[in-house]
């Protein structure tokens, strides 16, 4: 069995790490490189960086900090933000990223997933999916341009259908960003994760809602996700990664303990 992964998420805006609640009202957390170093030293398995306004601004992620991060950490990291072409992805990988993640650009042009997978291999192509639970219809819907609350909009895709589609097109991993839970720290949406796990045959990463060590355990044990991504609990030092991994290991979760 592959070890489960703990993945700090760093949302980047104007060259700094920020964090919002339900993708709104972002506050500045700190500088990119020192935070990346801290998480690597604490025992993170991987880091994810989202340049959250790149797609909505019509630009590609700023590559200058990508190379700086690559110089100071020795764990894999994934970068997302406005990657619309094979060439965009190639530059970010050349600057030192191990994976690239696409979200809104994949919704605009689903063939991009296949072109990236064909060129660089499925192992480094991640598709991020921003999913919103609508109580009225009791359904999960995919949103795009979520980095800018003024431009955020619903798509015509139901989350389940989009998960199936991106796998057919060559996604090597899926990060499910559960918008309702984002930043509120009351637990991952286990119902949604369990439902999507049944149709997701590539690694599935849970994102949105972690507030306690028990929440990570529930995601791994009850929904069988491959990794758990979190931001605010790590940024605000509510949870220490090393202590979290020790707890998970004691609970029987297969995980790399530092």
Swiss-Prot record:
It catalyses: 5-[(5-phospho-1-deoxy-D-ribulos-1-ylimino)methylamino]-1-(5-phospho-beta-D-ribosyl)imidazole-4-carboxamide + L-glutamine = D-erythro-1-(imidazol-4-yl)glycerol 3-phosphate + 5-amino-1-(5-phospho-beta-D-ribosyl)imidazole-4-carboxamide + L-glutamate + H(+). SUPFAM superfamilies: Ribulose-phoshate binding barrel. The active site is at 11, 130. It is an enzyme of class 4 (lyase). Its main location: cytoplasm. GO terms for molecular function: imidazoleglycerol-phosphate synthase activity; lyase activity. Keywords: Amino-acid biosynthesis, Cytoplasm, Histidine biosynthesis, Lyase. Coiled coil: none annotated. GO terms for cellular component: cytoplasm. Belongs to the HisA/HisF family. PANTHER family: IMIDAZOLE GLYCEROL PHOSPHATE SYNTHASE HISHF (PTHR21235:SF2), IMIDAZOLE GLYCEROL PHOSPHATE SYNTHASE SUBUNIT HISF/H IGP SYNTHASE SUBUNIT HISF/H (PTHR21235). IGPS catalyzes the conversion of PRFAR and glutamine to IGP, AICAR and glutamate. The HisF subunit catalyzes the cyclization activity that produces IGP and AICAR from PRFAR using the ammonia provided by the HisH subunit. HAMAP family: HisF (MF_01013). This is Imidazole glycerol phosphate synthase subunit HisF. It comes from Yersinia enterocolitica serotype O:8 / biotype 1B (strain NCTC 13174 / 8081). The gene is hisF.
């Amino acid at each position: 069995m592959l070890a489960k992964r703990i993945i700090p998420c760093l949302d980047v805006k104007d060259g700094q790490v920020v964090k919002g609640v339900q993708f709104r009202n972002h506050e500045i957390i700190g500088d990119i490189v020192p935070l990346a170093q801290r998480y690597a030293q604490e025992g993170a398995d991987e880091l994810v960086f989202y340049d959250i306004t790149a797609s909505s601004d019509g630009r590609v992620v700023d590559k200058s900090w990508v190379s700086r991060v690559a110089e100071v950490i020795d764990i894999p990291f994934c970068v997302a933000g406005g990657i619309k072409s094979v060439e965009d992805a190639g530059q970010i990988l050349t600057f030192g990223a191990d994976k690239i993640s696409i979200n809104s650009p994949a919704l605009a042009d689903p063939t991009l997933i296949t072109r990236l997978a064909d060129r660089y291999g499925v192992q480094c192509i991640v598709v991020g999916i921003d999913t919103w639970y609508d109580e009225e219809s009791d359904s999960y819907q995919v949103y795009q341009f979520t980095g800018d609350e003024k431009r955020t909009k619903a798509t015509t895709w139901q989350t389940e259908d989009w998960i199936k589609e991106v796998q057919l097109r060559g996604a090597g991993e899926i990060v499910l960003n559960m918008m309702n839970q984002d930043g509120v720290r009351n637990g991952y949406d286990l119902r949604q994760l369990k439902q999507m796990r049944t149709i997701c045959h590539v690694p599935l990463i849970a994102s949105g809602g972690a507030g306690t060590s028990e929440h990570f355990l529930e995601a791994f044990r009850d929904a069988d996700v491959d990794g758990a991504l979190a931001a605010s609990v790590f940024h605000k030092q509510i949870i220490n990664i090393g202590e979290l991994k020790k707890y998970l290991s004691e609970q029987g979760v297969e995980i790399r303990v530092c």
